[in-house]
């Protein structure tokens, strides 16, 4: 038996580094603050009041990660935008139900805490919260020796929002004749990255040095996920939105049916837009079928919105004013017997 005195640091956990990180991120956290938030960092739990404007407030919650986009970001030493991806994946899922995001928490786990890297990641999380009007109220930084390879870390996010009970968007109002609008994506967002990494492997591409349309391939593939919260909330105020689908894992085939009644079918016109260069590159280099592309990737479409034809002009104007690239991508029809709920023509 050794007489050597052991400390937590000897076991690989540096409490000082954790405290240093907290000090580093205080400014980032502060800029996301909402008036409903009570107290600051350091409490055992974060306190947040409900906004007073809601008569029958319904809380909406979500949790997500960024998948293996994180592997690519780590490999390319690009840590400052993956946090925005994390927030986007959560808040975009909330806003499709009409909810305004209130607060966000993150979980950051690593084998050895590298303060500079973690601070970059959390700055990105704060950026995402600021873009979506959501308060970063806390999180957990877990330093776990022996659990991760050197330099690796993992991320998860948790978000809570609120919506007026009478204004929940659940797809039940969708009917034949509704028009479908598309909101452009900023790239692959945070889905399909295991296939993206496989394409990089089999093609021998180097994302850091290879270029596509005049900029590094890495910029196309690591472009931060677009956050649609403020644009969509503005649209909901001015148009009769029947349903919104966030195109994440499962692509067109799986996400659009999630917001359709069992009797409805979405008909998508693929001639209405051109795939961005990154998706053409992926399909060509990976020899990926059209069906698989639409199942795995958003192919340039971040959200699909169903609304009555009478509201289309207003909706397009509102979205343009909000800085979105939006267009008519299809329509809703009655579902025929033996037919699929999504048809891409």
Curated annotation (Swiss-Prot):
Subcellular location: Cytoplasm
Alphabetized InterPro entries for the sequence: PurM-like_C_dom, PurM-like_C_sf, PurM-like_N, PurM-like_N_sf, PurM_cligase
Chief localisation class: cytoplasm
Cellular component GO terms held in the UniProt record: cytosol
Enzyme category, top tier: ligase
Pfam families reported for this sequence: AIRS (PF00586), AIRS_C (PF02769)
Known EC number: 6.3.3.1
PANTHER family in the cross-refs: TRIFUNCTIONAL PURINE BIOSYNTHETIC PROTEIN ADENOSINE-3, TRIFUNCTIONAL PURINE BIOSYNTHETIC PROTEIN ADENOSINE-3-RELATED
The family this protein is said to belong to: Belongs to the AIR synthase family.
Molecular function terms, GO-annotated: ATP binding; phosphoribosylamine-glycine ligase activity; phosphoribosylformylglycinamidine cyclo-ligase activity
Pathway per the UniProt entry: Purine metabolism; IMP biosynthesis via de novo pathway; 5-amino-1-(5-phospho-D-ribosyl)imidazole from N(2)-formyl-N(1)-(5-phospho-D-ribosyl)glycinamide: step 2/2
Name of the featured protein: Phosphoribosylformylglycinamidine cyclo-ligase
Protein keywords: ATP-binding, Cytoplasm, Ligase, Nucleotide-binding, Purine biosynthesis
SUPFAM superfamilies for the chain: PurM C-terminal domain-like, PurM N-terminal domain-like
Gene that produces this protein: purM
GO BP, sorted A to Z: 'de novo' IMP biosynthetic process; adenine biosynthetic process
Recorded superkingdom: Bacteria
Catalysed conversion reaction: 2-formamido-N(1)-(5-O-phospho-beta-D-ribosyl)acetamidine + ATP = 5-amino-1-(5-phospho-beta-D-ribosyl)imidazole + ADP + phosphate + H(+)
């Amino acid at each position: 038996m050794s007489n050597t005195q052991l400390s937590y640091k000897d076991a690989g956990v540096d409490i000082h580094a954790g405290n240093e990180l907290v000090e580093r991120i205080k400014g980032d956290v502060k800029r996301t603050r909402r008036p409903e938030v009570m107290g600051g960092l350091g409490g055992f739990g974060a306190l947040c009041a409900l906004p007073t404007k809601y008569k029958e407030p319904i809380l909406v919650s979500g949790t997500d990660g960024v998948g293996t986009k994180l592997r690519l970001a780590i490999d390319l030493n690009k840590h400052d935008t993956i946090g925005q991806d994390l927030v986007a994946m959560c808040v975009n899922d909330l806003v499709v139900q009409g909810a305004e995001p209130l607060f966000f928490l993150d979980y950051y786990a690593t084998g050895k805490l590298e303060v500079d890297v973690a601070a970059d990641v959390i700055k990105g999380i704060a950026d995402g919260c600021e873009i979506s009007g959501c308060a970063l109220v806390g999180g957990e930084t877990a330093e776990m020796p022996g659990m991760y390879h050197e330099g690796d870390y993992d991320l998860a996010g948790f978000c809570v929002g609120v919506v007026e009970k009478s204004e929940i968007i659940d797809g039940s109002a969708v009917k034949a004749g509704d028009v479908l609008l598309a909101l452009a994506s900023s790239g692959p967002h945070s889905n399909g990255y295991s296939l993206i990494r496989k394409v990089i492997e089999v093609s021998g591409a180097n994302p850091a040095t290879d270029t596509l349309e005049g900029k590094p391939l890495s910029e196309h593939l690591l472009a931060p996920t677009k956050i649609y919260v403020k644009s969509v909330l503005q649209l909901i105020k001015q148009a009769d939105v029947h349903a919104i689908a966030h195109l994440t894992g499962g692509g067109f085939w799986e996400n659009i049916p999630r917001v359709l009644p069992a009797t409805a079918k979405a008909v998508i016109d693929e001639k209405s837009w051109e795939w961005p260069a990154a998706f053409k590159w992926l399909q060509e280099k990976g020899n990926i079928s059209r069906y698989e592309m639409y199942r795995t990737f958003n192919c340039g479409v971040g959200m699909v919105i169903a609304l009555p034809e009478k509201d289309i002009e207003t909706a397009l104007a509102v979205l343009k004013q909000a800085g979105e690239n939006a267009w008519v991508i299809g329509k809703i029809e009655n579902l025929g017997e033996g037919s699929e709920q999504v048809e891409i023509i």
